[in-house]
UniProtKB/Swiss-Prot annotation:
UniProt protein name: Homogentisate 1,2-dioxygenase
InterPro entries according to UniProt: HgmA_C (IPR046451), HgmA_N (IPR046452), Homogentis_dOase (IPR005708), RmlC-like_jellyroll (IPR014710), RmlC_Cupin_sf (IPR011051)
Residues with N6-succinyllysine modification: 414
GO cellular component term, pick one: cytoplasm
Subunit structure: Homohexamer arranged as a dimer of trimers.
Pfam families membership: HgmA_C, HgmA_N
NCBIfam families listed in its UniProt record: hmgA
Pathway noted in the entry: Amino-acid degradation; L-phenylalanine degradation; acetoacetate and fumarate from L-phenylalanine: step 4/6
UniProt source species: Pongo abelii (Sumatran orangutan)
The keyword Nucleotidyltransferase is assigned to this record: no
Sites bearing N6-acetyllysine, chain numbering: 98
E.C. numbers: 1.13.11.5
Catalytic reaction(s) noted: homogentisate + O2 = 4-maleylacetoacetate + H(+)
Family membership: Belongs to the homogentisate dioxygenase family.
Length: 445
């Protein structure tokens, strides 16, 4: 595969032309009477026209035929995609899933859309407020099929297998330890090269942003220059049997046929684009004196709610770093949280739980449900020599954190057959160390 090219930056005003058609972007205006190369001008809006400039999202696409040229949409089977948060009764228990099983290609060919499974979520699509967490399990590429999401943005986290993603803006190669965001309404198709697995965070009605840095300053965490946007690429391809365009609309799937590939955008400009990011570029902030800092310091992207400082969803990672805090229990502390915490593992192990939490699996600690290090981790960390040490080398755990109370789907609790019924047992060996007559040796007599 030839090396793909990208544009660097987050949320930038960008422009790109396929080099096969120089001068394909109109000069000085968006929709001339006749576009260069006799292309059609089409605007893709990601925000209301009247949003402030700082939040206004739109791009202009110059394409061979316009997107409107298709047959009517018809409802199709949703498979395991759902936005019904009342399928099963609520469950406040700590939940952990073993690695989700990828179907064997010898048994059945499954592409990313067919292999999409909703695990949990909350909120309402029709009012543009909420989120869903999906697992994708696939073994074959999307052939003459593309997908777009009318309901929200997808943040895609591949765990196993590379994704070659065709979009209307160009192509992206996304590998494990990278993420990508495909925003609302953007059509895409994904090629895979092996049995493939990953996680998707979907948010309704908002877009992902870089978190505010506050006293950290102008630089740090995920730096804008490390986000990559594809460059224009098109194919002028007729599809005699029809190309299938799949739309997720109000939580249901619909399909329409058209005669050509939708990836026919010769040039584009704007600030509403797909993008990718390599997690190795995250600049870690950590405590260098004492105590365990709150995990918000590891936020890569946030989707803000209307309440200041409160997110519909945060994407947080736990990257390789130095641990140097003195007089401190260094693993994550025991916690009860007003937020919901879903965790996944791309590779390696998670520092607070060496066993049971495996790559390709997940865990959900719901609102106010207690969680924290397992018994083995507590005993070791309480007695460890506090020398500077590397933490999480060779690993990458992540968290989708939300202010919403997440409901688990029927597939998540039952049909996936991956729920670990023994998860609670990792805390059972925790014992009391209470010493009523304890005296701190540092205190004077």
């Amino acid at each position: 595969m030839a090396q793909l090219k990208y544009i660097s930056g987050f949320g930038n005003e960008c422009s790109s032309e396929d080099p096969r058609c120089p001068g394909s972007l109109p000069e000085g205006q968006n929709n001339p009477q006749v576009c260069p190369y006799n292309l059609y001008a089409e605007q893709l809006s990601g925000s209301a026209f009247t949003c402030p400039r700082s939040t206004n999202k739109r791009s202009w696409l110059y394409r061979i035929p316009p997107s409107v040229s298709h047959k009517p949409f018809e409802s199709i089977d949703e498979g395991h995609v759902t936005h019904n948060w009342d399928e099963v009764d609520p469950d406040p228990n700590q939940l952990r899933w073993k690695p989700f099983e990828i179907p064997k290609v010898s048994q059945k060919k499954v592409d990313l859309v067919s292999g999409l499974h909703t695990l949990c979520g909350a909120g309402d699509i029709k009012s543009n407020n909420g989120l869903a967490i999906h697992i994708f399990l696939c073994n074959t590429s999307m052939e003459n099929r593309c997908f777009y999401n009318s309901d929200g943005d997808f943040l895609i986290v591949p765990q196993k297998g590379n994704l070659l993603i065709y979009t209307e803006f160009g192509k992206m190669l996304v590998q494990p330890n990278e993420i990508c965001v495909i925003q609302r309404g953007m059509r895409f198709s994904i090629d895979v090269f092996e049995e493939t697995r990953g996680y998707i965070l979907e948010v309704y009605g908002v877009h992902f942003e870089l978190p505010d840095l506050g006293p950290i300053g102008a630089n740090g965490l995920a730096n804008p220059r490390d986000f990559l946007i594809p460059v224009a690429w098109y194919e002028d391809r007729q599809v005699p049997g029809g190309y299938t365009v799949i739309d997720k609309y109000q939580g249901k799937l619909f399909a329409a046929k058209q005669g050509v590939s939708p990836f026919n955008v010769v040039a584009w400009h704007g600030n509403y684009t797909p993008y990718k990011y390599n997690l190795k570029n995250f600049m870690v902030i950590n405590s260098v004196a004492f105590d365990h800092a709150d995990p918000s310091i590891f936020t890569v992207l946030t989707a803000k709610s209307v309440r200041p400082g409160v997110a519909i969803a945060d994407f947080v990672i736990f990257p390789p770093r130095w641990g140097v805090a003195d007089k401190t229990f260094r693993p994550p502390y025991y916690h009860r949280n007003c937020m919901s915490e879903f965790m996944g593992l791309i590779r390696g192990h998670y520092e607070a739980k060496q066993g049971g939490f495996l790559p390709g699996g997940g865990s959900l600690h719901s609102t106010m449900t207690p969680h924290g290090p397992d018994a083995d981790c507590f005993e070791k960390a309480s007695k460890a020599k506090l020398a500077p040490e590397r933490i999480a080398d060779g690993t990458m755990a992540f968290m989708f954190e939300s202010s919403l109370s997440l409901a688990v789907t029927k597939w998540g609790l039952k049909a996936s057959r991956c729920l670990d019924e023994n998860y609670h047992k990792c805390w059972e060996p925790l014992k009391s160390h209470f010493t009523p007559n304890f005296r701190n040796p540092a205190e004077p007599n």
